[in-house]
């Protein structure tokens, strides 16, 4: 009865909303309106058929389901009718509709489990627990531990559509395990499986309530069901089984669990889709025109990207290097408002303030006695465990081989001003990340201003997003270790320096004061990169094409003013180079020895040398290996470097080579086309960036694999400038097609929207890929922050 009424009601509602655009436009209802109404009605019922498949759409169909489906039809009708009627009225009309769309998607789709479980009749699964099973039994509670991990339920003989833990708490008293995870293997028998069969696993975050219920898709009545618990375990985190619960409810009606975070994410995604559609004004207005809507879009993009910069470094509490009574409490000293743990740069800052270049810590006598202290096997054989891992060891003392600049910028002044040692890297990386992000906006903006003034606002915004998301920027933020800290500092200074250089090259010579300031600070930033990540200094060659037109082409260098500007450009480079060379010579006896070969790590860096067999696997893995996608969160699988060479390979896991995993970069192949090449060559400086960045990419890949290994974070050495080169190609292609389309060329007019769609799709893919890498890559949020990992997992996989 109710289903028939619902069918009729939804037909009526669909018909009304299908006709609304005709009424608003004062025209007769057309077949197109009828098609919209029919499509709307069909879409709602197809969704209902999928959503109510447990136990079936017609089973338990009552008034609540009638109201739910009618309301969903009304929401979908309102949205479609509104977009059809007001879609071309501009943002003021569309934004409220997009908000309503996001609200409905969160309510009806994100909370589909609330609607499809409303009619369930729950029962307590613990009533069927086998009395012979060894578990901890309290007053109304059951406990599991490492010796008791098995639950068996017998003679259930009724369907089970979901399971929910009631009153689940952790019994683990170890502070490091305050946030932990347990994985239950589910086995049982049902109408289709008379023998015990493994059905799947249930990953439970003890501080992630969304994970404490799971949907089951079993056949018919369940006879027996077993749950076997195992603590999550990886190289970086291991959790024991230690939990207590009051019960396990089967066929539990799910609560309405509205997520503001998911609603905001959906709304922003819809806003981006609307803003980047081919007919959008963002594509038809020049960025340099300064339109208020374009600037507002840039502000939204910047705020979203900056929000992730601020929060990501704190996603892995035990790796942040700081602790309070409420955050990372396992490392809190119990007294300070904020306490910091030992960090290499903190120890270096303390030594520098005490007039020393080495660290104050004394190496163990057993290490000093070894013939080759860099041999990890020899250290293990001598049972020397009390060493400073990844520190340089030279002439019996510990040193920091990582570049000194991050320490000079943050740790040293912090201790000098406050007296507090070991400033954590995470807050420093937040500041550096914001600088890098601002520099991305600035560098791309200068490129548009100088070479592509006709570039659309959408192309500019997509380019900024591509540089930030396509590089390993956010992956560095996720791991606030000294390795990532030094690389991020180098990348931020490099991009800031390039921004200042480009701005200087665009500054009129009449404004000499501003010009000199930009030259000095631009060169200072780029020079300081050598004290962070020396490899990145290869991009200093960009100074030649940037300043060539003015100082060589226009012969300004021959003038007194030009010579003074050249001196301003060179002075910071000379001073920084002299300082770094003195620092190296004072420690290791050579101005060119940064000390990386004296690293106490898992292999003897002093014997590494050059070997050509490393190059092939490194180039393939770093550049061309395809991402390995899977059907479950986080949707990406890590891969290891593969090689047939019988050699010690130093590597970390990858999720695809940068060229294969970043479609935005594929446009770098366009210069192979003669017509595009001619167009690009009209902007010779831009062409130098386009050609130079892939060349540096190859050189750095080879250098990194020979010097250290094949590591994903090393892609950050060149990826920002490489992505900038790709952005220049997109600008060039868009500009060429726009000019030809304006002249009436049909092919160009048809190709331009396609190009823009592909550009937006490439950045969208990159954003999804980067989001997945944050949850897929080591040291694995699944173990470092289970509550965050599993909560996000369930927000994405809402159907579970």
Where are these regions (language model features)?
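Specific aromatic-rich, kink-prone transmembrane helix
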Residues: 488-509, 524-526, 540-542, 721-725
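Transmembrane-helix signature of polytopic, membrane-embedded enzymes
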Residues: 28-45, 441-472, 492, 508-517, ...
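Perimembrane helix-loop-helix junctions
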Residues: 539-574
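Transmembrane-helix motifs of polytopic, lipid-linked glycan transferases
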Residues: 423-453, 496, 500
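Start-transfer (signal-anchor) and selected internal transmembrane alpha helices
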Residues: 3-40, 64-110, 260-343, 458-460, ...
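Membrane-interface alpha helices of multi-pass inner-membrane proteins
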Residues: 495, 517-533, 540-541, 567, ...
């Amino acid at each position: 009865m109710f289903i028939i009424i619902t069918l009729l009601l939804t037909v009526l509602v669909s018909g009304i909303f299908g006709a609304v655009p005709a009424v608003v436009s004062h025209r007769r209802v057309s077949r197109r309106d009828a098609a919209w109404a029919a499509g709307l009605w069909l879409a709602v019922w197809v969704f209902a058929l999928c959503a109510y498949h447990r136990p079936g759409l017609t089973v338990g169909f009552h008034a609540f389901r009638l109201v739910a489906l009618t309301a969903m039809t009304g929401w979908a009708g309102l949205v479609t009718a509104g977009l059809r009627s007001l879609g071309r009225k501009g943002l003021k009309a569309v934004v409220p509709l997009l908000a309503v769309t996001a609200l409905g998607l969160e309510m009806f789709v994100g909370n589909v489990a609330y609607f499809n479980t409303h009619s369930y009749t729950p029962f307590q699964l613990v009533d069927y627990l086998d009395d012979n099973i060894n578990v901890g039994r309290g007053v109304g509670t059951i406990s599991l531990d490492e010796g008791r991990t098995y639950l068996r339920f017998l003679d259930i003989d009724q369907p089970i559509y979901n399971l929910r833990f009631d009153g689940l708490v952790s019994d683990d008293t170890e502070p490091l395990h305050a946030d932990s995870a347990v994985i239950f293997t589910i086995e049982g028998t049902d109408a289709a499986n008379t023998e015990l069969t493994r059905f799947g696993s249930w990953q439970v975050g003890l501080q992630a309530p969304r994970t404490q219920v799971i949907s089951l898709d079993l056949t018919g009545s369940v006879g027996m069901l077993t749950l076997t618990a195992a603590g999550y375990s990886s190289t970086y985190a291991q959790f024991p089984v230690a939990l207590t619960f009051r019960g396990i409810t089967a066929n539990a009606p799910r609560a309405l669990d509205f997520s503001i975070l998911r609603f905001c994410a959906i709304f922003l995604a819809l806003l981006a889709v609307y803003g980047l559609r081919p007919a959008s004004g963002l594509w038809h207005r020049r960025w340099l025109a300064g339109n208020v809507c374009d600037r507002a879009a840039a502000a939204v993009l910047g705020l979203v990207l900056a929000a992730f910069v601020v929060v990501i470094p704190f996603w892995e509490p035990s790796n942040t290097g700081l602790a309070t009574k409420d955050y990372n409490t396992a490392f809190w000293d119990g007294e300070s408002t904020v306490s910091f743990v030992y960090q290499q740069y903190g120890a270096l800052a303390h030594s520098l303030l005490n007039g020393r270049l080495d660290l104050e810590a004394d190496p163990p006598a057993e290490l000093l006695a070894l013939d080759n202290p860099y041999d990890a096997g020899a250290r293990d054989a001598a049972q020397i465990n009390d060493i400073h891992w990844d520190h340089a060891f030279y002439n019996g003392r510990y040193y920091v081989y990582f570049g000194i600049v991050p320490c000079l910028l943050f740790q040293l002044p912090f201790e000098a001003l406050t007296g507090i040692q070991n400033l954590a890297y995470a807050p420093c990386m937040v500041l550096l990340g914001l600088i890098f992000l601002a520099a991305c906006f600035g560098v791309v903006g200068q490129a548009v201003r100088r070479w592509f003034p006709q570039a659309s606002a959408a192309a500019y915004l997509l380019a900024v997003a591509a540089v930030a998301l396509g590089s390993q920027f956010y992956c560095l933020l996720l791991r606030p270790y000294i390795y990532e800290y030094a690389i991020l500092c180098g990348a931020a200074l490099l991009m800031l320096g390039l921004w200042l250089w480009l701005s200087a090259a665009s500054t009129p010579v009449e404004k000499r004061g501003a010009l000199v300031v930009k030259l000095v600070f631009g060169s200072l930033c780029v020079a300081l990169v050598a004290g962070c990540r020396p490899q990145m200094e290869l991009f200093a060659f960009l100074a030649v094409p940037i300043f060539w037109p003015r100082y060589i082409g226009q012969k300004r260098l021959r003038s007194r003013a030009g010579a003074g500007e050249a001196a301003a450009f060179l002075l910071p480079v000379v001073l920084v180079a002299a300082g770094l060379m003195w620092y190296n010579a004072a420690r290791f006896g050579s101005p060119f020895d940064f000390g990386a070969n004296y690293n106490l790590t898992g292999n003897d860096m002093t014997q590494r040398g050059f070997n050509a067999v490393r190059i092939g696997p490194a180039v393939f893995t770093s550049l061309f290996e395809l991402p390995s996608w899977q059907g479950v969160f986080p949707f990406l699988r890590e891969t290891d470097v593969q090689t047939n060479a019988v050699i010690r390979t130093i590597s970390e896991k990858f999720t695809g080579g940068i060229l294969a995993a970043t479609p935005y970069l594929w446009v770098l192949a366009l210069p192979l086309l003669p017509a595009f090449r001619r167009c690009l060559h009209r902007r010779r400086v831009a062409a130098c960036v386009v050609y130079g960045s892939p060349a540096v990419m190859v050189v750095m890949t080879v250098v990194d694999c020979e010097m250290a290994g094949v590591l994903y974070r090393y892609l950050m050495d060149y990826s920002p400038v490489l992505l900038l080169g790709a952005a220049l190609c997109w600008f060039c292609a868009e500009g060429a097609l726009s000019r030809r389309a304006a002249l009436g060329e049909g092919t160009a007019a048809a190709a331009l929207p396609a190009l823009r769609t592909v550009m937006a799709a490439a950045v969208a893919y990159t954003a999804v890929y980067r989001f997945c890498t944050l949850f897929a890559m080591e040291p694995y949020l699944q173990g470092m922050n289970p509550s965050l990992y599993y909560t996000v997992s369930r927000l994405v996989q809402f159907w579970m």
